[in-house]
C-alpha cells in the first residue's frame, strides 16, 4: 500500500517535536527526513532550507501561543486564568519560545495574552495607565516565575540548601516558618499565591461591582 503524500504540516509537526525534545541544534534536514521516512529533497520541497524551516516553526509557535481564552465569572478570575495559561504555554515550549525570542518576535508572541489582559482590565473598570499596569505586571510576573522555575530545575545541588540555612536565628524565632521552608517548593502553589496577591493589588482601584471576588 502506497504511503500517503507527505504534507507541509506533517513536516512542521515533526520538526517541532524534534525541537521540543532536543533543542534547535538537533534539527537537521537529514535528521528530519529520517524521522519522516522520506528523502531530504522532499523536506526542501515542502519548507525550503533550514532557515526557512525555522522561520515557519517560529510563525507557527507565535500563532499557537496566541490561543489564550480567559475563563471565570469575574475580571479577577479571568486575569488569573490568563496568567496560568501563559505560564503553561511558556513551560511547555521552552525551545520554541527561545527561537521566537532569537528572531525578535517576543513582543508579537505576547500580544494576544496582552490583549486578553486589556479586555479584562477594561471589564474591571480600569483604563489608560492603570490598564497598562495590569498588562505589564501580569506578564512580568509570569515570565519571571518561569525563569526562576527553569533556573532551579537546572541548578546544581545547593550546599548548603534551604533546610540548612534556615534555623531559629535566621527565621527570627519562627519555628513554623523553618518547617515550611524545609519542605520542597511547590511552584504551582507559589505561582497561584503570587498571582492572587498581584491581581488583588492591581484591582484595588477598580469599582467594587466590576472587581468581583478574589481569584482562586
Which residues make up each language-model segment?
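Alpha-helical DNA-contacting segments of helix-turn-helix folds
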Residues: 19, 54-61, 104, 109, ...
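A contiguous pocket-lining binding segment that forms or flanks enzyme active sites
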Residues: 115-152, 156
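Hydrophobic alpha-helical connector segments
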Residues: 67-109, 128-131, 135-138
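C-terminal peripheral helix-coil segments that are non-catalytic and often amphipathic
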Residues: 154-216
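Amphipathic alpha-helical interaction segments
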Residues: 52, 81, 95, 112, ...
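Short hydrophobic clusters on alpha-helical segments that form packing/core surfaces
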Residues: 11-19, 57, 61, 86, ...
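Helix-turn-helix
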Residues: 10, 14, 18-52, 56
Amino acid at each position: 500500500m502506497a504511503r500517503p503524500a507527505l504534507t507541509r504540516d506533517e513536516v512542521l509537526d515533526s520538526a517541532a517535536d524534534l525541537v521540543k525534545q532536543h533543542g534547535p541544534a538537533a534539527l537537521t534536514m537529514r535528521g528530519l527526513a529520517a524521522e519522516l521516512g522520506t528523502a531530504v529533497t522532499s523536506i526542501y520541497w515542502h519548507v525550503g532550507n533550514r532557515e526557512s524551516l525555522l522561520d515557519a516553526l517560529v510563525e507557527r509557535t507565535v500563532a499557537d501561543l496566541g490561543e489564550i481564552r480567559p475563563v471565570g465569572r469575574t475580571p479577577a478570575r479571568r486575569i488569573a486564568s490568563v496568567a496560568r495559561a501563559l505560564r503553561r504555554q511558556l513551560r511547555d515550549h521552552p525551545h520554541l519560545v527561545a527561537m521566537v525570542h532569537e528572531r525578535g518576535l517576543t513582543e508579537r508572541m505576547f500580544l494576544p495574552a496582552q490583549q486578553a489582559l486589556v479586555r479584562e482590565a477594561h471589564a474591571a473598570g480600569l483604563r489608560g495607565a492603570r490598564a497598562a499596569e495590569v498588562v505589564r505586571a501580569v506578564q512580568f510576573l509570569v515570565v519571571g516565575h518561569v525563569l526562576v522555575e527553569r533556573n532551579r530545575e537546572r541548578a546544581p545541588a545547593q550546599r548548603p540548601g534551604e533546610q540548612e540555612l534556615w534555623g531559629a536565628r535566621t527565621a527570627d524565632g519562627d519555628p513554623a516558618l523553618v518547617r515550611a521552608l524545609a519542605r520542597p517548593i511547590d511552584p504551582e502553589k507559589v505561582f497561584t499565591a503570587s498571582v492572587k496577591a498581584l491581581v488583588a493589588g492591581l484591582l484595588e482601584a477598580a469599582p467594587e461591582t466590576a472587581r468581583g471576588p478574589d481569584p482562586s
